[in-house]
Amino acid sequence: MARPQQRYRGFRQRHWGSWVSEIRHSILKTRIWQGTFESAEDAARAYDEAARLMCGTRARTNFPYNPNASQSSSSKLLSATLIAKLHRCYMASLQMTRPSSLPEAPRIIASPNNAVKGIGADAMLLPKKREQEEQETGGNLDFKKVKVECSQQFKPLEEDHIAQ
């Protein structure tokens, strides 16, 4: 027998009647628990708030977002710790997706043996590091170009990993 279709996304009902909400992040492959709620609507609203914090404005939610509505009703569904955790996930996913969308730029590393013409030492080193290097080398720094590549492997989600 098939499961009854849920009205909202991001939650389920326990066999004793309470409702639980969790959110999964497809890029980070993480699952974050929002908690246990008395009603399906509260669980769905907690999911929506978490989705907006984790995915930004592109999040798929149960209810339309109203920026003029008071935040007190939704913010009481999520703890401050959970909000911070969701924000960290959002920032981590931005960092993971940003390098793949931008062309790779070579990084320049100081080296006493290799020179790149037209680049001064002042432009490439932070002030404290620059002072240290000038003391060690007497102010004569050379540079070498190094191309840094970042490749990450992602496995596609299997059907049994995706919550419907």
UniProtKB/Swiss-Prot annotation:
Main location class: nucleus
Annotated organism of origin: Lupinus polyphyllus
Name used for this protein in its record: Protein PPLZ02
Alphabetic keyword roster: DNA-binding, Nucleus, Transcription, Transcription regulation
Record's subcellular location: Nucleus
Function: Essential for all lupin cells independent of the respective tissue.
Gene Ontology cellular component annotations, sorted alphabetically: nucleus
PANTHER family: OS02G0797100 PROTEIN, SHN SHINE , DNA BINDING / TRANSCRIPTION FACTOR
Pfam families: AP2
Lineage: Eukaryota, Viridiplantae, Streptophyta, Embryophyta, Tracheophyta
InterPro entries: AP2/ERF_dom, AP2/ERF_dom_sf, AP2/ERF_ERF_subfamily, DNA-bd_dom_sf
Gene label: PPLZ02
DNA-binding feature ranges: 7-64
